Amino acid sequence: AVVVVVAAELPEAAEAAEPGEPVEGPEAAVEVAEPALVPVAEPEAEPVPVVAVEQPVAVEAAPAAVVAEADVSVPQPPAEPAEQPVPEAEAEVVAEVVSEPESVVPEQAPEQAPAPEPEPGAMPEPGPVSEPEEIPAPARSAPAPGYDDAEREAVLRVMRERRDIRNGFRGDPIPHEVLLRVLEAAHTAPSVGHSQPWDFVVIRSAETRSTMHELAQRQRDAYAKTLPKGRAKQFKELKIEAILETPVNIVVTADPTRGGRHTLGRHTQPQMAPYSSALAVENLWLAARAEGLGVGWVSFFDEREMVRALGLPEHLEVVAYLCVGYVDEFPEEPELTQAGWSKRRPLSWVVHEETYGRRALPGEEPHDLLQETVANIRPLDAKALGEAWERQKRMTKPAGALGMLEIISAQLSGLSRVCPPPIPEPAAVAVFAGDHGVHAQGVTAWPQEVTGQMVANFLGGGAVCNAFAHQVGAEVCVIDVGVASELPATPGLLPRKVRPGTADFTTGPAMTREETLAAIDVGIETARDLVAAGNRALLTGEMGIANTTVSSALISVFTGVDPGEITGRGTGINDEMHARKVDVVRRALELHAPDPADPVGVLAAVGGLEHAAMVGLILGGASLRTPVVLDGVSAGAAALAARAIAPESLAACIAGHRSAEPGHVAALNKLGLRPLVDLDLRLGEGTGALLALPLVQSAARAMHEVATFDSAGVTEK
Ligand SMILES: Cc1cc2nc3c(=O)[nH]c(=O)nc-3n(C[C@H](O)[C@H](O)[C@H](O)COP(=O)(O)O)c2cc1C
């Protein structure tokens, strides 16, 4: 068994330890200059056989130092931490990480670092560094002028300062001429074929507003019932409409028949009619902002119910229900961001050059997602880490009495750069599903179709991971990164198939390097989506018949342990099949001779699509300073690959559980991670990580809620 020692960025000399406190070994103080997590062998614990054959640290890609003889040790904070914490790390995380490109890049450095993302609410940075290519054309005259600086700034300002408002409305009436200006602005919107498909129904009647309020309330309740507990708690606090508090409500409709059957541009895309009306809404919203009027868009309606309640013609589509009124103030940030419900996605995530995936802001060279992500992975923040240890000492409990949970809460502080750290809630388990060509070798008793069938089960809510997620209040997010069969579109399924299953790695590489990188990107993008959607913890999950064979191969490559020692019985196989499975792994390793220094190459040769995606999730989570709770053997294999790509990604990892698969023990030892739960589980799907989630949340909550000796008036020892 091993224990994780959390070490910081730029640590300095350790403070003198107090009596009874765990003491950091001297080696750690010397060696922790770079690594985020330093695995430390725990000598008095049960010896684990694979430790004996572990590769010497010197040949590892990771800079982490293994301190073989140390006691169970917990590092002390550096005397004067070098890095400042970010006080509101939560709201800023997404935007902020983009501006820190100077971290470790293991392969080659990107040709050009991405430009920093403008702070939300700030003016955009000056224009592109290189001039856009000119289209050769006879120069006749100067192009039509844009606005002067002040006018342009006014236009940009109104866009920046437009807010969706639900709180702080005033009852002041809206003068007719003001409302008229706002409606005129809406009416100048662009529209498909100039069909101008909108109508505006201006509602002032208290009775109608009360009817609409009741309809919205019913939908709110119905929506709340669908939420995982972690989300439902947050949602309860949110205000989602101000129908009764605003003097004017405006219904914006779209007439899909307006302009007749030959409306230009609507021929193949009927949705252009409601899109046009949505543009009218944006115009209205901006004009209202310029008048000092707040607007709140309410979409908690059943459309047909609404059409009937308002007596609208049946052929109309309702595009928007808007609450309009004067307000006390316009918040700088979206109300959902302020409430911690969501985060702003940086512009650099969504601008592609020429083809999708070549991300680049104008004037930048396109950069690849993996390089950008790795560049943003930072060590734990020394100051927050130091504060966490200090706080643990002052909490009303004997020093060290929370054992491993103290280490977790310090890690969470260092990761988030704040102490106490945010409670990792809401959380989402990302279940990546993929099939494996090596299934053909008879390494499992289960038919391959079960992968797709289990995906349907996850989406239907009937699997063990659903039950555990329900219990702990987490969201289940299912990603098809490589299931062999075609899966029907289903709510909750992210269709991200890179290829329909890997090839049989006993006869050739499992996949190409490009496919491997694409699967890693799927994981990174999943991490980005889940974190931007407000999740504060990511859990790894996976489904893929035959994937323990793949995990064994990966673990063998990264740990150097013989396949015979780490290849387990997966879903339960007999001796004969087990012997074949070991032989299959052995043959694959002989065929490919994968080089652990080239982790992407290892994944391509003997990996799985879900393993590569989990690598991406770990790297993505680490780059967004969000904890990643690892599940079992496949997550362990992925974490080894992630560490080989970016050693500091381990700073975000928490081992949820120890699987019954022998390979998992080898992986955890190599990673230096101590599992929180040890129940002989061998299911996957994220089940072990889900069981561990409340422990991780408890570690953070204790930091928030446990009194200190001073505050509680308790005498110290
Ligand atoms: C199509 C659409 C529907 C929306 N529906 C709701 C809603 O029902 N309730 C709500 O509180 N906000 C709603 N909003 C507002 C968004 O939550 C808001 O635009 C987003 O959080 C960003 O904040 P900002 O508009 O202040 O920048 C809606 C916005 C749009 C564009």
Q: What is the role of each PLM region?
A:
Residues 131-172:
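N-terminal targeting/leader regions
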Residues 220-228, 240, 311-338, 512, ...:
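A glycine-rich helix N-cap at a beta->alpha junction
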Residues 1-146:
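Long, low-complexity intrinsically disordered regions
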Residues 369-717:
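N-terminal loops that bind phosphate or other acidic moieties
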Residues 43, 93, 101-103, 118, ...:
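N-terminal amphipathic, basic-rich helices that act as targeting or association modules
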Residues 182-187, 250, 258-309, 460-476, ...:
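Small-aliphatic-rich amphipathic alpha-helix that forms the alpha element of a beta-alpha
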Residues 321-377:
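C-terminal helix-cap and adjacent tail motif
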Residues 196-277:
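Glycine/small-residue-rich phosphate/adenosyl-binding loop
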